[in-house]
Swiss-Prot record:
Pfam hit, one: RRM_2
Composition bias type Basic residues, residue spans: 170-184
Disordered, as annotated region: 170-211, 351-370
PROSITE patterns in UniProt: RRM
GO molecular function: RNA binding
InterPro entries for the chain: Mei2-like_Rrm_C, Nucleotide-bd_a/b_plait_sf, RBD_domain_sf, RRM_dom
Organism field: Oryza sativa subsp. japonica
Chain's role: Probable RNA-binding protein that may play a role in growth regulation.
Protein name: Protein MEI2-like 7
């Protein structure tokens, strides 16, 4: 049994149930001004007042000024002494950890060292991995025992049985997936250039004007200057024959044209040579046939063997549309100094569809020219007879 000793110098303990009320301590004397404190000499008789803060060290780099401090000076009070070394059972105990939990040198981020965020993310990843493994282990259950014979292990299936077609047949699928072969996208992407005078379209194809559904008359630009109406008819016959052979399988309307006009330069034409203005007009019976000519010849070049020209064909919509409007316009036009009807606009009735391709120029009864032709006047050379002084 432990014996507790009492302190004989302790104050008596009051056992009364009544509360004891003691008089409050007297208030401290009012503070004395500094000038009065030093003038009366109280600083010499009594201890100087305590300094309002603790001074543990001083790093004064300025000179000392005596007029700023009283002659008696202030009492320098040092801070509390550092705690001594703690001993536990005669052995030096470890120092307590800092309040923040980690030493300052461990809170510093070194170059290349992981940050606090990296450490947290790695810990979360490890925890998630452990949870996933545990879930996989919990989800696995042994196969239930059946009353039938034990199942036998068979060899793995060969690679041929893993083919998509074989898998589809085993599953009873009616449609087997097969990679589609690259196909051409309709007639817009499948031009059929005529090999008579032109080559295949250049790559990339020049910008093409989109023809409207009502456009049947087109303007063929950048034609060789030596090309005549007969050459243009031969080119169109070959194109229509190719288009009709392709369209005959699908029941589409036939490609036919009923008017051709190659604008000639009458000042440069004579019996030895002919020269055009570089463009021609063609009217088709349907707008689809006009678009077919544009798809086939737009962006093509002329063959060097036929015409020594490097022009690129450009096909656009004409300003005047329709056969009737063209006949009225060309019928009122006068063509001065035109040597032959070959240079006039030609109207075909019935329309040409390429069935006579390769037969040469069309027969005269099938061609009707429109326009007023004025032949050139004969030139008479006047000679002067006599002596010239």
């Amino acid at each position: 049994m432990a014996v507790t000793k009492l302190n004989p110098s302790a104050a008596p303990f009051h056992c009364s149930r009544r509360h004891l009320f003691f008089a409050p301590p007297p208030p401290p004397p009012p503070p004395m001004p500094a000038y009065q404190y030093h003038a009366t000499g109280a600083c010499a008789a009594a201890a100087p007042p305590p300094f309002p803060f603790f001074a543990t060290y001083s790093c004064a780099s300025l000179p000392f000024h005596g007029h700023l401090y009283p002659p008696c000076g202030y009492q320098a009070q040092m801070g509390p002494a550092p705690p001594g070394a703690a001993f536990a059972k005669g052995v030096l105990a470890a120092a307590p950890p800092p309040p923040h939990g980690r030493p300052p040198h461990k809170l510093m981020v070194c170059k290349g060292a992981p940050t606090v965020t990296d450490v947290k993310l790695r810990a979360q990843a490890r925890a998630a991995a452990r949870v996933g493994v545990a879930a996989a282990v919990r989800g696995w259950r042994p196969a239930p025992a059946t009353a039938g014979p034990p199942r036998m292990l068979v060899a793995a299936a060969p690679c041929g049985m893993l083919h998509p077609a074989a898998v589809a047949r085993r599953r009873g699928m009616s449609k087997v997936y097969k990679p589609r072969k690259p196909q051409r996208a309709g007639r817009e992407r499948s031009p059929s250039p005529s090999p008579v005078f032109t080559t295949r379209p250049m790559s990339p194809t020049p910008p093409m004007q989109k023809l409207k559904p009502a456009h049947t008359t087109v303007m063929v630009r950048n034609i060789p200057n030596k090309l005549t109406r007969s050459d243009m008819v031969r080119l169109l016959d070959d194109h229509c024959a190719r288009e009709n052979r392709r369209r005959g399988r699908g029941g589409e309307p036939r490609a036919e044209y009923d008017l051709v006009y190659v604008r000639m330069d009458f000042g440069m034409c004579n019996k030895e040579r002919s020269s055009n203005m570089g463009y021609a007009f063609v009217n088709f019976t349907t707008a689809e046939a006009a678009r077919g000519l544009q798809r086939a010849l737009h962006g093509c070049r002329w063959k060097r063997s036929a015409f020594d020209s490097g022009k690129i064909i450009d096909i656009r919509a004409a300003r005047i549309q329709g056969k009737d409007a063209l006949v009225r316009h060309f019928g009122r036009t006068t063509y001065y100094e035109c040597d032959t009807d070959e240079y006039l606009p030609a109207v075909f009735s019935p329309p040409r569809d390429g069935s006579t391709a390769g037969a040469g120029a069309p027969s005269p009864p099938a061609v009707k020219t429109v326009g007023i032709r004025v032949p050139p006047r004969p030139i008479t050379l006047l000679t002067h007879r006599g002596n010239v002084n």
